[in-house]
UniProtKB/Swiss-Prot annotation:
Keywords: Amino-acid biosynthesis, Diaminopimelate biosynthesis, Lysine biosynthesis, Methionine biosynthesis, NADP, Oxidoreductase, Threonine biosynthesis. The keyword Amino-acid biosynthesis applies. This is Aspartate-semialdehyde dehydrogenase. The gene is asd. It comes from Synechocystis sp. (strain ATCC 27184 / PCC 6803 / Kazusa). Phosphate binds at residues 101, 214. It catalyses: L-aspartate 4-semialdehyde + phosphate + NADP(+) = 4-phospho-L-aspartate + NADPH + H(+). Homodimer.
């Protein structure tokens, strides 16, 4: 059994931070010490962990002393601010933000896809974007059998992707609309209840938003396949938690549907959900709180002989963020890569 290590959660009070806390407990992660770090306004408060109330500390230059591992989920600016302090303290940072994902020397890791990449870290390992992780876990089993040439993906992203306050905003907007009031938007740019809109991340020079470009660039890096052609359209939808994606794949030659179903059903981190007679396939409601990515509606693309279509749903706070980070941490401990 691996030796227990000293862990800090940076951003412990956020949606991903609290999920990290739950996962470390439920997966019996080998902890020698657990330190909860957040902004000064949360300092002095407590969070429960395995029956104990742990104090939250304000992050400062000495906060990482003695830590072996830091699970960072406080946003890109915070990760950049403290990365040097963390690595100087001798700890490894598993970072959930986008700050370091495309830095060439920083591994971008999904344990079901490229676990060996974690071995080459220089003190920082990046956790991919939620939509990238969910799609990657679902389609990598097919890529292993026959390299994917092109991916066309449309996402249906829940409010929780914008944080806990966005979820509350959608609830309030729903009540307002049902009571005949005009819904107000403060966290998201527009009312999301009974509505949807293209993802609200900044638009880039090529007219794709940043969220869409993350899917393109990160998938290529994780798959170590710069030649995959990828296009994405990301949409925010009025669902509280769990993202969904419609994915079209193109291969060099026809890919048998039954082979695809078998490969996905056997793959780690994925669950095949299909009942064609009942028209029952993955739904965000079913994926919420689940570790596995739910995949279904696998079918031949009638517009292309070498194409497949599939539908997936996954909890972006768990596998799309916190669970993937904990799995990376487990990998580092089990293989002695800290």
């Amino acid at each position: 059994m691996p030796s227990p290590i000293r862990v800090a959660i940076l951003g412990a009070t956020g949606a991903v931070g609290t999920e990290l806390l739950e996962l470390l407990a439920s997966r019996n992660f080998p902890l020698a010490e657990l330190k909860l770090l957040a902004s000064p306004r949360s300092a002095g408060k407590t969070l429960e962990f395995q029956g104990e109330k742990l104090p939250i500390q304000a992050v400062d230059g000495s906060a990482f002393k003695g830590c072996d591992l830091v699970l960072a989920s406080a946003g890109g600016s915070t990760s950049k601010r403290w990365a040097e302090e963390i690595t100087k303290a001798g700890a490894v940072m598993v970072d959930n933000s986008s700050a370091f994902r495309m830095v060439p020397e920083v591994p971008l890791v999904v344990p079901e896809i490229n676990p060996e990449a974690a071995q080459n870290h220089q003190g920082i390992i990046a956790n991919p974007n939620c939509t990238t992780i969910l799609m990657g876990v679902a389609i990598y089993p097919l890529h292993q059998l026959q390299p994917i040439k092109r991916i066309v993906v449309a996402t249906y992203q829940s409010a929780s992707g914008a944080g806990a306050m966005a979820m509350e905003e959608v609830k309030h907007q729903s009540r307002d609309i049902l009571e005949g009031k005009i819904p107000q938007a403060e966290i998201l740019p527009y009312p999301l209840a009974f509505n949807l809109f293209p993802h609200n991340s900044p638009i880039t020079a090529n007219h794709y938003c940043e969220e869409e470009m993350k899917m393109v660039q990160e998938t290529r890096k994780i798959f170590a396949a710069e030649d995959i052609r990828i296009t994405a359209t990301c949409v925010r939808v009025p669902v509280l938690r769990a993202h969904s994606e419609a994915v079209n794949l193109e291969f060099a030659t026809p890919f048998p549907v039954e082979l695809a179903k078998t490969a996905i059903a056997k793959a780690p981190g994925v669950k095949l959900v299909e009942d064609w007679q009942k028209n029952y396939f993955p739904m965000p409601m079913d994926a919420t709180g689940q570790d596995d990515v739910l995949v279904g509606r696998i079918r031949q693309d009638i517009s292309h002989p070498n194409g497949l279509d599939l539908w997936l749903c996954g909890d972006q706070i768990r596998k799309g963020a916190a669970l993937n980070a904990v799995q990376i941490a487990e990998l580092l401990v089990e293989r002695g890569w800290l």
